[in-house]
Amino acid sequence: YCQKFLWTCDTERKCCEDMVCELWCKLEK
């Protein structure tokens, strides 16, 4: 899961379905 204050995105964990985390996931891909 994703913590809103950290905005972490991992391969094993699904990104937040919110706005920011999804963008970060693509950037850190």
From Swiss-Prot:
SUPFAM superfamilies: omega toxin-like. Expressed by the venom gland. It comes from the Eukaryota. GO terms for molecular function: potassium channel regulator activity; toxin activity. The keyword Ribosomal protein does not apply. GO terms for cellular component: extracellular region. Its main location: secreted. Keywords: Calcium-activated potassium channel impairing toxin, Disulfide bond, Ion channel impairing toxin, Neurotoxin, Potassium channel impairing toxin, Secreted, Toxin. The keyword Glycoprotein does not apply. Disulfide bonds join 2-16, 9-21, 15-25. It is found in: Secreted. Belongs to the neurotoxin 30 (phrixotoxin) family. Negative results: does not show activity on insect voltage-gated sodium channel (Nav) or insect calcium channels (Cav) in cockroach DUM neurons. The presence of a 'disulfide through disulfide knot' structurally defines this protein as a knottin. Insect-selective neurotoxin that potently blocks insect calcium-activated potassium (BKCa) channels (Slo-type) in cockroach dorsal unpaired median (DUM) neurons (IC(50)=3.7 nM). This occurs in the absence of any shifts in the voltage dependence of activation. At high concentrations (330 nM), it partially inhibits cockroach delayed-rectifier potassium channels (Kv) currents. May interact with the turret and/or loop region of the external entrance to the channel and does not project deeply into the pore of the channel. This is Lambda-theraphotoxin-Ec2a. It comes from Eucratoscelus constrictus.
